[in-house]
Amino acid sequence: MSKQRLQQNCVIALAVLMSWAAAAEPPEPIPVKVVVVTMFEVGADEGDRAGEFQLWKERRNLTKTFPFMGYRDLYLDPEKGLLVLVTGIGTARSAAAIMALGMDPRFDLTKSYWVVAGIAGIDPEDASIGSAAWAEYLVDGDLSHEIDAREIPEDWPFGYFARYTKRPFDVDKPAPTGEMYQLNTGLVNWAFAQTKNLTLPDTDAHAKAHRALYTDHVNAQRPPFVLKGDHVAALTFWHGALMNDWANQWVDYWTQGRGEFVSSAMEDTGTYLSLSWLNRVGRVDVSRLLVLRTASNYTMPPPGVTAAENLLAENKGYSGLAIAVESAYQVASTVVDQLIVGWAVYENQLPGAVDQKDLP
């Protein structure tokens, strides 16, 4: 073989090897500005009764779908950098889904903001169905000891008490190790400031009629509004005046009087836990998490109705589901859009620490 022919063959072989190497390189991860976290959908993704996800699918430019080994596929607006996730119901599913997304090599989530936008039960002492609450404290309602109330000492108010303590609300409790998480105060206050004057939907006659039953609670009868209020997450869907009293005291106990129980659902401590672990390995920034919960039902019955009667009635359909889903979309969208529009600043500096005059 001539020297010239040998050189030609070497060049061809090198070109082939380089093309193989290029083909083997994974694509660059897609940078995501905002992840919207929803928990469930009622039926199809579009065109029927809406759960937490459907309005995002119908109203946003989520043109790109990514198969996802979770509850549902992932949907992306590639122009705005908006990714929407459905975790499934419960802390176990939310923790698993968030961890799976956080480790997904297809996405760069290092600068992403995470906005939980879901429905919840609401304390009638604080707000009405359709209202929207931004949480600063997430308190876990599962990590505890429990004795059946029929077997507890006479001077105990509840059978629930913190691990490694001797009675309910024992002041000698250990530091929280999953029982309570605090979000970024500045970011939460900023989100509330952007949305506190929004007029929320209030067109559902059934929701209005149900609100009117809560004659002992002034805030429960108000038209929907935006507030700040803290959250209990538990795998048990609890209901009733006594459990509502426990939730208020539980939040007060773990936040040392700084928090106020307002909403109850089943996922957010799992979401925070996974983000906190992903934060340790540099995959996300947990200080960029926001939790918005909108009221689909009350956490206790109105006067003259038992807890069992009210819960069973709600199981047939939440009295405020439609307006809660709409409120979640409208309030969360306001914050999502602000984050995207202000990305030149918010990519590297959290809104709560930004002088608003510096924004474009």
PLM regions with names:
Residues 2-3, 19, 262:
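Generic secretory/membrane-interface signal
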Residues 2-11:
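Bacterial N-terminal signal peptides that target proteins for export
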Residues 15-23:
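Hydrophobic h-region of N-terminal signal peptides that target proteins for export
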Residues 25-360:
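Accessory terminal and edge-of-domain segments that mediate assembly/interaction
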